[in-house]
Structure formats: structure tokens, C-alpha cells
UniProtKB/Swiss-Prot annotation:
Binding locations of Ni(2+) 1: 138, 140, 221, 364
UniProt protein name: Urease subunit alpha
Pfam family, one: Amidohydro_1
Catalytic activity: urea + 2 H2O + H(+) = hydrogencarbonate + 2 NH4(+)
HAMAP family: Urease_alpha (MF_01953)
Modified residue annotations for N6-carboxylysine: 221
Residue ranges the record marks as coiled coil: none
InterPro entries given in the database record: Amidohydro-rel, Metal-dep_hydrolase_composite, Metal_Hydrolase, Urease_alpha_N_dom, Urease_alpha_subunit, Urease_AS, Urease_asu, Urease_asu_c
Keyword Hydrolase: yes
One GO CC term on file: cytoplasm
């Protein structure tokens, strides 16, 4: 017998369904449910008197192999692939299927492989948003505490380099040399994150590069502080082509060894991930943004300039002096710093992100960027652009779904593709590692409710451990069992080069994390960036710093007020 429910009542019990709209935090961004894979009347719901009981939603007789390990019920999935509602099935640490879970003997439309049995755990996803774990592809490994800060924000993968608070690491994302790479892989083996380390690529002769890749480096970093000259760029890219690894780039701010055209010429059309394709982070001054118009360049920017606000310029000078070991008493150092901080190009960076011309947002952790704010700054940028530029022409219906999908891709699937990791992570799709983040809509982008790492809860909002229920104050993000002991190795990946895997030398490190080789890092480019593949000719006036893309002047005002800020946090 059918039963009709009021929409508000249905949403309260099972979460939003097709046509319902959800505001993301206190932003102006509205997500609308595009489709619903659950079956009306047969929804999964756990609790006293609810559906997931024996011989109802839970199928008796289902073996451990047949049943899911865990099911997230009635989740609103926000991913580059769409904005939709579904159950998410997890098996052996991976997303087994997305659709309708339950007992196929008594329920309609149960998706194959989504049986709920006596061996199945449940996470109530109704009323929550689920996104893929974030991928931060610009990490300075300055201190291990970054990992926990990032995980608490919803980031589950680090790509970058460093050896701790060494002067070189404070400025550059390089783990130089085979010994450092081995030691850092061992040191980060206890962090509940997927890890990929980049070696140092600044050399005009290839000796020394092979040893780093053999030790497990997933890429090589070219940084101006080590000398990013055209010969070094050419040498590093030539080596990377042979090894199928990514090259990350921070170009020459001072234009001592050449200008932006010289760096572009040194690329010779080869794939490169250009860090700081932005308004103030470094690289050829003042026109590094031109690099965003090259088809072989995967451009990214970092969160200190995300988005452009009335405080951005003042904050940057002090940060820059510290991060790059500069001296206020040396005029040339001050001139170097000031040349990198330009309001006009920072404003253009906002718009280039909104156009999909800059493909990735990352942190630049403790080296001008904040490791725990990648996700927050991304959504603040999206809100600012929605507020200043209005709806995107690609939008359909009374929602911001396309813009939402574009921005979530910047810190999930696109960095995963750029670094050859998208076969494992980066999206909410079957077969991927179950790195998933649950958010209450009102806290979206600021504070996750649960962070699931490889199918097990690693971090979560939790109340007083001595309380009689989980929710009494103080209620804040705390480490959970997925971040402890041997579970870390079972639920996380150490990404390494294919050479390290093939030669087998990496196994002598006895890492507890599963090893996975990066793949298809070469022969890709802007066109491979999901929803962020806009290619326009970009010019920067050397006198006024005005930026034009496709002939259009890119100009916007700095924000005075942002969402996801002091309404949620004391500091």
C-alpha cells in the first residue's frame, strides 16, 4: 500500500531527494539534488524500529563475502561527477558500489553488490553531504602535525616534499636524495594519509635524478630557490618523460635566467604541473599567469591568495620574508618580495579559477599557505565569484551545481589526475579507495562530521569521552580508530614511482602502507582537467599588471566579508 509524505517530513527522515536544494554552509552556493538512486518506500534507515533489521533491510544468510563491510545510507554526494543521492557501499576499504543498498529478497531495486548483512556496519548519511577526500598537491613536509590538521579538515592525501623544518624545506617542496626519500616514506608511514614524495629536480645534468626516482619519488620539483633555469627545466622534463613521473614547477620570480617565454620554450610542449600559476605566490613577475594559457601546462594556485580580500596584500609581505629566507635590511630582498605581491593579478586569479582556467587549488603548507584551509578557501572563492559574477552560463535550473562541481574538482580529482593517482583516489566512484568526508550542510567547507580513511573512520566530531552519549561538549574533531596503530597501513597508500615498484627496492623499507605506482603522468595537460580545462590566451600588462583572458579584462573587487569564517571560528 502506497503512502504519501510531505516533502519536509521526507527530508527530515531520509534526507533531500530530487529537486530539493541545499545551501553549502553560509555561502551563497545552492546545490540541487539531480537524481536519487534510493527507492522510495524501500530506503535504508538504521535505528530502533527502522529498516536495517534482520529479514527486513538486512538480508539473513548473507556471507561476509556477499555483504558490504559498511554502508553509508541516503547520502547527498557532491562530486565532479554530479550532485545526487545514493547509498555508498564499502568493501575491503574501497567503494564497492553506489546506488541502492539493502535486502534484495524484500526490497526493490537493490544494486548488485550492495547487500546489507549481519557483517555490515552502517553510517547514517541522511541529512549529510559526502565528498571525496581532498588531495593537497603542494605540501612542504615541515612538521608531521600538518597531517592531523589536514585530515581534520577533510584532506586525505599529501603530495609534496621536504625533510622537516630544514631551511630548504621551509621554502621548497623537495625531498632531496634517496636517503631522505626513504626516511620520509618510513616517517610518514604512521600518518593516516596517502603520501607521495617529490624529489629535487633542479639540475642541468641528469645524474642524481635516477636515484631519487628509484627510491620512490613520484615526481621532481623545480624551484626558483634552487635555480629554475631553462636548462634545468629541459633536463628534468626529459628525465620525467622516460620515467612517467610528474614535474612540479616554481619559476624564476626575478627573471634572472629568463622570462616566462623562455620557460615556456624550455617545456617544449611537455606536461608540467605549474605551481603558483597565480597572482602572488611566485614565479615570473609579473606575468606568470600567462602559463595558464598553455595546453601542456596543468596550472594550480595556493590558498593564501584564495580569495582576494582587503587583507590579502598586507598579509603576504611578512609571510614571504620568512618563507624564502629574506632579510628586510637588504633592499634587493624587499624588492624581490614586493615584485611578487600584485593586487591586479590576485584579482585575476579569482576569475581564472571561476572560468576553469586554473585547474587545482592546494595549500603550500607552512610556506605561505595553510594546510587546514584548502577546502574552506576553495569554497570561499566559489562564493565570492558567485556573489560578484553571478551564475555561470553552464548552469541549468535554479542552482549552482556546475560551479560546485567545478570547484570540488579543484581539490579532488584534478590533483589526482595530475599526479597519476586517479586510479586510486580523487572522486566518489566505484573502485576508488573509500576516502570519504561527511559534512552537515550547515558546516560544509569548515568542519567535517566524519573523515573516513580507506573505509574506516579516522577523524570525527566527538564529545566528552566520559559522557553517557557521544555528543556532549566539548564537541570537536578528534582522532578515531582509523588513525591508530596498524589500521593506518591497512587504510592508506604510499604512492611511489613505477621504477621503485618494478625494481622492488622500495620493499626493503618494510612500509605498512600499501604501495601503489603512479601512472600516466606524462602526455596529459589542461584538457584532462575535469571541468577546469578552459584554455584562453592570457596577457599581463607589465606596467599596470592588468590581466586579460581571451581579450577580456579580468578585474574584481577584494572581498570585505567572507562566509565560512568568523561565524564558525574564534580565530
Amino acid at each position: 500500500m502506497s503512502h504519501t509524505m510531505q516533502r519536509r517530513h521526507y527530508v527530515d527522515i531520509y534526507g533531500p531527494t530530487v529537486g530539493d536544494r541545499v545551501r553549502l554552509g553560509d555561502t551563497g552556493l545552492i546545490a540541487e539534488v539531480e537524481r536519487d538512486h534510493t527507492s522510495y518506500g524501500d530506503e535504508c534507515k538504521f535505528g530502533g524500529g527502522k529498516v536495517l533489521r534482520d529479514r527486513m533491510g538486512q538480508m539473513p544468510g548473507a556471507s561476509n563475502d556477499e555483504a558490504l563491510d559498511c554502508v553509508i545510507t541516503n547520502a547527498l554526494i557532491v562530486d565532479w561527477t554530479g550532485v545526487y543521492k545514493a547509498d555508498i557501499g564499502i568493501k575491503r576499504g574501497r567503494i564497492a558500489a553506489i546506488g541502492k543498498a539493502g535486502n534484495p529478497r524484500v526490497m526493490a531495486g537493490v544494486t548488485p553488490g550492495m547487500i546489507v548483512g549481519v557483517t555490515t556496519e552502517v553510517i547514517a548519511g541522511e541529512g549529510h553531504i559526502v565528498t571525496a577526500g581532498g588531495v593537497d598537491a603542494h605540501i612542504h613536509f615541515i612538521c608531521p602535525q600538518q597531517g592531523y590538521e589536514a585530515l581534520a579538515s577533510g584532506v586525505t592525501t599529501f603530495v609534496g616534499g621536504g625533510t622537516g623544518p630544514a631551511t630548504g624545506t621551509n621554502a621548497t617542496t623537495c625531498t632531496p636524495g634517496a636517503r631522505h626519500i626513504s626516511l620520509m616514506l618510513q616517517a610518514t608511514d604512521v600518518l593516516p594519509l596517502n603520501i607521495g614524495l617529490t624529489g629535487k629536480g633542479n639540475t642541468s645534468s641528469p645524474e642524481g635524478l635516477l636515484e631519487q626516482v628509484r627510491a620512490g619519488a613520484v615526481g621532481l620539483k623545480l624551484h626558483e630557490d634552487w635555480g629554475t633555469t631553462p636548462p634545468a627545466i629541459d633536463c628534468c622534463l626529459s628525465f620525467a618523460e622516460h620515467e612517467d613521473i610528474q614535474v612540479t614547477l616554481h619559476t624564476d620570480t626575478l627573471n634572472e635566467s629568463g622570462y616566462v617565454d623562455d620557460s615556456i620554450a624550455a617545456f617544449k610542449g611537455r606536461t608540467i604541473h605549474s605551481y603558483h600559476s597565480e597572482g602572488a605566490g611566485g614565479g615570473h613577475a609579473p606575468d606568470i599567469l600567462r602559463i595558464c594559457g598553455e595546453p601542456n601546462v596543468i596550472p594550480s594556485s595556493t590558498n593564501p591568495t584564495r580569495p582576494y580580500t582587503v587583507n590579502t596584500l598586507d598579509e603576504h609581505l611578512d609571510m614571504l620574508m620568512v618563507c624564502h629566507h629574506l632579510d628586510r635590511n637588504i633592499p634587493e630582498d624587499v624588492a624581490f618580495a614586493e615584485s611578487r605581491i600584485r593586487g591586479e593579478t590576485i584579482a585575476a586569479e579569482d576569475i581564472l579559477h571561476d572560468l576553469g582556467a586554473i585547474s587545482i587549488i592546494s595549500s603550500d603548507s607552512q610556506a605561505m599557505g595553510r594546510v587546514g584551509e584548502v577546502i574552506t578557501r576553495t569554497w570561499q572563492t566559489a562564493h565570492k565569484m558567485r556573489d560578484q559574477r553571478g551564475r555561470l552560463p553552464e548552469e541549468q535550473g535554479d542552482n549552482d551545481n556546475f560551479r560546485i562541481r567545478r570547484y570540488v574538482a579543484k581539490y579532488t580529482i584534478n590533483p589526482a589526475i595530475a599526479h597519476g593517482m586517479s586510479h586510486e583516489i580523487g572522486s566518489v566512484e566505484p573502485g576508488k579507495l573509500a576516502d570519504l568526508v561527511l559534512w552537515r550542510p550547515q558546516m560544509f567547507g569548515v568542519r567535517p562530521e566524519l573523515v573516513i580513511k580507506g573505509g574506516l573512520i579516522a577523524w570525527a566530531q566527538m564529545g566528552d569521552p566520559n559522557a553517557s552519549i557521544p555528543t556532549p561538549q566539548p564537541y570537536y574533531m578528534r582522532p578515531m580508530f582509523g588513525s591508530l596503530g596498524a589500521a593506518v597501513g591497512e587504510t592508506s597508500i604510499a604512492f611511489v614511482s613505477s621504477r621503485a615498484m618494478d625494481e622492488g627496492s622500495i620493499r626493503r623499507l618494510d612500509l605498512k602502507k600499501r604501495l601503489s605506482a603512479v601512472r600516466r603522468c606524462r602526455k596529459i595537460g589542461k584538457a584532462d582537467m575535469r571541468l577546469n580545462n578552459t584554455l584562453l590566451p592570457i596577457t599581463v600588462d607589465p606596467e599596470t599588471y592588468e590581466v586579460r583572458a581571451g581579450g577580456e579584462l579580468l578585474r574584481c573587487d577584494p572581498a570585505k566579508i567572507l562566509p565560512l569564517a568568523q561565524r564558525y571560528s574564534l580565530f
